[in-house]
C-alpha cells in the first residue's frame, strides 16, 4: 500500500501577498511581546543573581565547628575490666578483645544518650556543604567595602553600579601612619640633577621637535585620508595645542594651529551643518546616514573647540598676563597671536559658508584697528577678500555691522583704514547688473487661460514639465533670489550711509572725514533722492569752511557730481559753486605735491564736463581746456599724459573749442588767467601756446599727445593717435605711465646717438699769444702761501 500523500502545500507567493495587514501586525506584536518577555525574564535573573552576590558579600562567614571527641570507653568500664580474669588470658587475646570492644559501638555506648550514633557526621557534612556554597577568598585579597553608585539604563533595563573600596583595619592604618611619620622624619639625600650643556639642550630640542612634527603629520594624514573614520583623531591633534614642553611649546603650538586650519579647509563640507531635531534623533536611520551624522557632529564640536582655542590665545596676548607662564613666555605670545589671526583670517575667507562664520567675523574685523601692524594688515587684507568674494551679501552685511558698531563704540576714534574697507563692497556691481536686467525685455508669464488658448495639449504638458524641471534645478543649485540679494544690499547700504552721516554730523574734524567723502563719492549714485538736498548743503558748508585738505575738497566735488549724474538728473540744480571751486584749485596739482590727487581730479573732470556735456557752456569748456594745458607744464609726465588725454576728449566733445588753436582773438576783452570764474575769464581770446613747449618734452608720449592736439585732435589721418593710446581713458593712461615704482615707460635706450660737432679754429694774433704765454709762465713760477694769511686773520 502506498503511503498517503501529504496534500498540504506551501503557500504561494500570491497567497502571501493576500495576507491581511491586521494579521501581519498581530504577528509583529506577538514577536515583540516574546522578545520583551524573554528580555524581562533575563533581567529578573540578573537582578536575583546580583542580590544573591550582594547578600553573600554583606554576611560575615562563620568559623567551622570543632568536633568534640568522646572520652575513651575504657574509663567508664574500669570496674568491669578489673573483674575479668586477665591472668588466665594471653596478651594476644587481651589485645584482640580491646580492639573488638572499640568496634562494638552498639554495646559500649551510653543508652541514656539521646543523640543518634551518626549525628555528628551529618552535622559535619551540613557545615561543609554550607561553606562550599559560599564564595571563597584568598588570603592575599583584602576586605573591600561596596559603595553603591548611580545606576545605568540601557536597552535591556536598569543596571545597578557598585564600586569596591578596600577596608583598612585600624591596626594597619596606625602602622601606615607611623611609617609615614618615620619617612617624613628621615631625610633622604636627593641626587643632584646633571646640568645639560647648550649643545645637549639644542640636540634634545631638535629630537623632540622632530618627534612632534612626525606625530602631527601622521595624525593629519590619517584624518585627510579617511575623515569619517578618523574624526576622533582631530581631538588628539587639537590636544597638542596644550604642549607643555617648554623647549618646543611655542613651535609645536604654531604648527598644530596651521595644520588644523588646513585640515578643516579640506574636510569641511560645502554646506552648513544644522543641529538635529528631537524627532530626527529618535528616528531610525540607515547605517551610512548614522555614520555621516556622527562625522558631522564630531566635526562641528572640534571646529568649535579649535576656534575657542584661537580666541583664548588672542585674549591672553591682549591682556599680557602678569602671571608668568613656565611654558610660554610673554614675548612668545605675540608670535602665537599672529599665527592665530592668520588662521582665523584664512578660515573667514575660505569657509564663508560654514558654521560659526559670523563669530569669526566678530573676532577678525575689529583687529583692523589694532596697534600691531602685522595683525592689522592681516585682518585688513582678509576683510577685503571677503568683500570681493561675497556673492550673496550675507558675509558683507555681517562685516559692515561689526564695522559700524566698532566706529560708534569707539566714539569715532578709529583708524581711517577701518572705513576704507567699505570701498571694497560689491554693491555697485550688483546694482549695475540689476539695472541692465531691468532694461532688458522680461519674459511674459503665461496664465492658464493663455496656455489653454495658445498651446495645444501636448505643448501644455511639455510646458508644465519644463517649469517643474526649472524649479528643481533652482532648488538643487540653492541659488539666491534677486529680491533677497537686493534686500541684503539695501540693508548693507543703509548701515554704510548711517555711519557716514553720523560722522558728517558729529565728527567733521575727525581723521575719518576723507574716508567718508571718498565712500560717499563711490556710493553717491545709490543714495535715496530724499537726502540729496541735505547732503549737497553739507558739502557746500564743508568746502566753504576752508578746513578741508586738497584731497578732501576734491572728494566733496566728486560726491556732489556723482549724486547729480545718477538719480539726480531729475533735479534742476546748477552746481556752479563746485565748478568754480575745482577751476580755482586745479593749480594745487604740481610736481612737488603728491601724484595721487591727479587721479581724483581726472575723475572729477570726467563727471563734470564729459558726462554732463549738455549742461556745460562753451565758455566753461574753453576755460577748463586752457587751464589744463597750462597745468600740464607743471606736473609729472604721467599726470601730463592724463591731462592731455582729458583735453583731447573735451576738444572732440566740444568741436567749437578749436578756436584756441588760432592766434586771432575773438570778441571783446583779454584773457584773465588769474580770475577764478571760468565763465568770465575770456578764454576765447587766448591760444594754446603751451602745446609748442610740450612738443619738446623729454617724455615721448607727451610729445605725441601735444602734436596730436596741435593738429586739432583728429580721429583719422596723419595726426591721429595710435589705437593703443586713443582707446584708453585718461585714468587708464595715468595708471599705465605711472612712475610710482621709479620706472620710466617707455624704457630709456642704453645707447644715445652722439652728434658730430665740427671743430672751430680761432686764429689769434702773434702778440696776443705771446702775452698769454708770458702771463701763464709768471703765475706758475710764483710761490703761493695761504697759511700766513690765515694765521694773520686768526690773530
UniProtKB/Swiss-Prot annotation:
Mainly resides where? nucleus
Region of interest called Disordered, as start-end residue ranges on this chain:
1-88, 124-144, 168-190
Does the entry feature the keyword Coiled coil, yes or no? Answer: yes
Q: Acidic residues bias: where?
A: 74-88, 171-181
Q: Give the family from UniProt.
A: Belongs to the CBF/MAK21 family.
Q: Which GO terms describe its molecular function?
A: chromatin binding
Name of this protein? Nucleolar complex protein 3 homolog
Biased composition regions of type Basic and acidic residues, renumbered to the chain? 22-39, 46-58
> Coding gene?
noc3l
Q: Which GO terms describe its biological process?
A: DNA replication initiation
Amino acid at each position: 500500500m502506498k503511503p498517503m500523500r501529504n496534500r498540504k502545500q506551501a503557500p504561494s507567493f500570491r497567497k502571501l501577498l493576500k495576507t491581511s495587514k491586521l494579521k501581519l501586525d498581530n504577528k509583529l506584536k506577538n514577536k515583540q511581546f516574546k522578545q520583551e518577555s524573554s528580555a524581562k525574564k533575563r533581567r529578573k535573573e540578573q537582578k536575583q543573581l546580583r542580590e544573591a552576590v550582594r547578600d553573600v558579600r554583606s554576611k560575615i562567614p562563620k568559623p567551622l565547628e570543632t568536633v568534640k571527641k568522646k572520652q575513651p570507653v575504657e574509663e567508664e568500664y574500669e570496674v568491669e575490666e578489673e573483674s575479668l580474669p586477665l591472668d588466665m588470658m594471653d596478651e594476644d587475646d587481651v589485645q584482640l578483645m580491646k580492639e573488638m570492644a572499640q568496634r562494638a559501638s552498639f554495646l559500649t555506648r551510653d543508652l541514656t544518650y539521646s543523640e543518634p550514633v551518626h549525628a555528628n557526621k551529618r552535622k559535619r557534612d551540613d557545615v561543609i556543604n554550607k561553606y562550599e556554597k559560599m564564595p571563597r577568598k584568598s588570603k592575599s585579597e583584602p576586605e573591600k567595602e561596596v559603595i553603591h553608585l548611580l545606576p545605568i539604563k540601557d536597552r535591556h533595563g536598569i543596571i545597578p553600579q557598585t564600586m569596591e573600596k578596600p577596608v583598612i583595619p585600624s591596626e594597619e592604618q596606625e602602622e601606615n601612619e607611623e611609617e609615614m611619620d618615620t619617612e617624613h622624619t628621615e631625610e633622604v639625600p636627593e641626587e643632584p640633577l646633571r646640568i645639560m650643556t647648550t649643545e645637549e639642550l639644542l640636540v634634545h630640542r631638535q629630537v623632540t621637535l622632530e618627534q612632534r612634527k612626525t606625530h602631527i603629520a601622521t595624525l593629519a594624514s590619517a584624518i585627510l585620508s579617511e575623515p569619517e573614520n578618523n574624526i576622533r583623531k582631530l581631538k588628539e591633534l587639537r590636544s597638542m595645542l596644550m604642549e607643555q614642553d617648554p623647549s618646543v611649546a611655542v613651535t609645536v603650538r604654531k604648527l598644530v594651529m596651521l595644520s588644523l586650519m588646513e585640515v578643516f579647509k579640506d574636510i569641511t563640507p560645502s554646506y552648513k551643518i544644522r543641529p538635529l531635531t528631537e524627532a530626527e534623533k529618535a528616528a531610525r536611520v540607515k547605517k551610512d546616514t548614522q555614520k555621516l551624522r556622527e562625522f558631522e557632529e564630531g566635526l562641528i564640536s572640534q571646529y568649535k573647540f579649535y576656534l575657542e582655542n584661537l580666541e583664548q590665545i588672542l585674549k591672553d596676548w591682549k591682556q599680557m598676563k602678569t602671571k608668568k607662564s613656565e611654558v610660554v613666555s610673554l614675548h612668545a605670545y605675540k608670535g602665537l597671536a599672529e599665527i592665530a589671526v592668520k588662521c582665523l583670517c584664512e578660515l573667514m575667507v575660505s569657509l564663508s559658508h560654514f558654521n560659526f562664520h559670523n563669530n569669526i567675523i566678530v573676532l577678525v574685523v575689529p583687529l583692523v584697528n589694532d596697534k600691531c601692524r602685522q595683525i592689522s594688515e592681516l585682518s585688513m587684507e582678509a576683510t577685503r577678500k571677503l568683500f570681493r568674494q561675497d556673492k550673496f551679501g550675507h558675509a558683507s552685511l555681517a562685516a559692515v555691522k561689526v564695522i559700524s558698531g566698532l566706529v560708534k563704540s569707539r566714539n569715532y576714534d578709529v583708524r581711517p583704514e577701518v572705513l576704507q574697507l567699505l570701498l571694497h563692497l560689491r554693491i555697485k556691481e550688483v546694482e549695475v547688473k540689476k539695472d541692465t536686467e531691468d532694461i532688458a525685455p522680461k519674459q511674459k508669464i503665461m496664465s492658464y487661460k493663455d496656455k489653454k488658448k495658445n498651446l495645444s495639449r501636448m505643448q501644455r504638458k511639455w510646458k508644465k514639465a519644463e517649469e517643474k524641471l526649472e524649479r528643481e534645478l533652482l532648488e538643487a543649485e540653492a541659488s539666491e533670489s534677486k529680491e533677497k540679494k537686493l534686500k541684503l544690499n539695501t540693508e548693507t547700504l543703509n548701515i554704510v550711509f548711517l555711519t557716514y552721516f553720523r560722522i558728517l554730523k558729529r565728527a567733521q574734524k575727525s581723521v575719518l572725514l576723507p574716508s567718508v567723502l571718498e565712500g560717499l563719492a563711490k556710493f553717491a549714485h545709490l543714495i535715496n533722492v530724499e537726502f540729496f538736498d541735505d547732503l549737497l548743503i553739507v558739502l557746500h558748508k564743508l568746502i566753504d569752511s576752508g578746513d578741508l585738505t586738497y584731497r578732501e575738497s576734491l572728494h566733496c566735488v566728486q560726491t556732489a557730481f556723482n549724486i547729480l549724474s545718477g538719480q539726480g538728473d531729475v533735479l534742476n540744480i546748477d552746481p556752479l559753486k563746485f565748478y568754480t571751486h575745482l577751476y580755482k584749485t586745479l593749480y594745487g596739482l604740481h610736481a612737488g605735491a603728491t601724484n595721487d590727487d591727479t587721479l581724483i581730479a581726472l575723475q572729477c573732470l570726467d563727471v563734470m564736463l564729459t558726462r554732463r556735456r549738455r549742461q556745460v557752456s562753451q565758455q566753461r569748456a574753453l576755460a577748463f581746456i586752457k587751464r589744463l594745458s597750462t597745468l600740464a607744464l607743471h606736473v609729472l609726465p604721467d599726470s601730463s599724459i592724463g591731462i592731455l588725454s582729458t583735453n583731447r576728449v573735451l576738444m572732440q566733445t566740444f568741436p567749437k573749442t578749436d578756436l584756441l588753436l588760432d592766434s586771432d582773438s575773438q570778441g571783446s576783452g583779454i584773457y584773465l588767467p588769474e580770475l577764478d570764474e571760468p565763465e568770465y575769464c575770456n578764454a576765447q581770446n587766448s591760444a594754446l601756446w603751451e602745446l609748442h613747449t610740450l612738443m619738446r618734452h623729454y617724455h615721448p608720449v607727451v610729445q605725441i599727445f601735444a602734436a596730436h592736439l596741435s593738429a586739432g585732435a583728429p580721429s583719422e589721418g596723419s595726426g591721429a593717435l595710435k589705437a593703443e593710446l586713443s582707446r584708453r581713458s585718461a585714468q587708464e593712461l595715468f595708471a599705465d605711465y605711472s612712475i610710482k615704482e621709479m620706472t620710466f615707460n617707455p624704457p630709456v635706450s642704453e645707447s644715445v646717438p652722439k652728434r658730430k660737432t665740427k671743430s672751430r679754429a680761432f686764429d689769434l694774433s702773434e702778440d696776443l699769444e705771446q702775452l698769454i704765454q708770458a702771463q701763464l709762465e709768471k703765475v706758475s713760477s710764483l710761490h703761493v702761501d695761504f697759511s700766513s694769511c690765515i694765521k694773520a686773520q686768526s690773530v
